[in-house]
């Protein structure tokens, strides 16, 4: 992995592959495991600023390239993946909210590698756990407050699929119904920015998502970053 990979614009390649016109902006957003949520916020802002009705947001990671196989406390947790969602800007009263945050002072900066992109990922798992179980419930409360909804109004809560214990801890802290919290990390591991859209796709294919359901997605990632959103689900029509 060299500078060619670092500066390669994935979004532009997708735009070309889909044969989209030149007046459809395409850009990459990097916010680690929070990337899908950050990308959704950027997409919503672009729709509001430039006009348009639909935005395609893709979360994708190939973390196996950045793992140190000797670091068994980290490398066994992650997987490669990609997922996508189409967002529609509507004139209806369907509730929507999104919140983001960052704490740059909490990052651990390793020594610089001799080649760009060659430093493996390292993580203080216990510190991340403490951060996550505090940030995720706050994100959920924020989007619920903004939409004047309650946990009971939600059909699903889709967390970043980092760790089952983190999700369980959030369920307990929120006094929530664990059945509303989807999990798939036992099959895919932590796929970083891909984890939320991959989970949503699995749920849609399994018939778990129904039109009109209110769904909250919450996540956290390196940086440190975090975010949450509340959307109304609508099946993607083909035609």
PLM feature spans:
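Short, small-residue-biased leader/transition segments that mark boundaries at the very start
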Residues: 2-7
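Condensing-enzyme catalytic core mediating Claisen C-C bond formation in acyl metabolism
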Residues: 69-134, 138-141, 220, 232-239
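Phosphate/pyrophosphate-binding loops at sites that engage ATP/ADP/AMP, CoA/4′-phosphopantetheine
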Residues: 138-155, 203-208
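Short beta-strand segments
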Residues: 1, 30, 54-61, 87-88, ...
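Short acidic, glycine/serine/threonine-rich loops at helix termini
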Residues: 8-10, 67-71, 226-230
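Acidic-glycine-rich active-site phosphate/pyrophosphate-binding loop
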Residues: 8-20, 56-63, 112-114, 166-176
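Flexible, glycine-rich active-site loops centered on histidine and acidic residues
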Residues: 46-79
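Claisen-condensing/thiolase-fold acyl-transfer catalytic domains that form or cleave C-C bonds
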Residues: 21-23, 29-51, 155-239
């Amino acid at each position: 992995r060299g500078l060619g990979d670092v500066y390669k614009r994935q979004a532009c390649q997708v735009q070309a592959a889909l044969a989209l016109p030149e007046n459809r902006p395409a850009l990459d957003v990097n916010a680690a495991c929070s990337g899908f949520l950050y990308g959704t916020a950027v997409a919503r802002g672009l729709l509001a600023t430039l006009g348009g009705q639909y935005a395609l947001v893709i979360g994708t990671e190939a973390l196996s390239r950045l793992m140190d196989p000797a670091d068994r406390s980290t490398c066994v947790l992650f997987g490669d993946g990609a997922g996508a969602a189409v967002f529609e800007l509507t004139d209806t009263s369907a509730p929507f909210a999104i919140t983001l945050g960052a704490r740059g002072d909490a990052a651990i900066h390793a020594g610089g590698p001799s080649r760009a992109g060659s430093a493996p990922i390292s993580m203080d798992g216990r510190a991340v756990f403490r951060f996550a179980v505090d940030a995720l419930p706050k994100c959920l409360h924020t989007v619920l407050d903004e939409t004047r909804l309650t946990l009971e109004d939600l059909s699903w809560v889709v967390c970043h699929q980092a760790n089952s214990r983190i999700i369980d801890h959030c369920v307990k802290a929120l006094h929530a119904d664990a059945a509303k919290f989807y999990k798939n990390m036992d099959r895919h591991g932590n796929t970083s920015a891909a984890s939320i859209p991959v989970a949503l796709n699995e749920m849609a294919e399994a018939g778990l998502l129904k039109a009109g359901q209110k769904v909250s997605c919450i996540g956290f990632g390196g940086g440190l970053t975090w975010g949450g959103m509340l959307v109304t689900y609508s099946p993607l029509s083909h035609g």
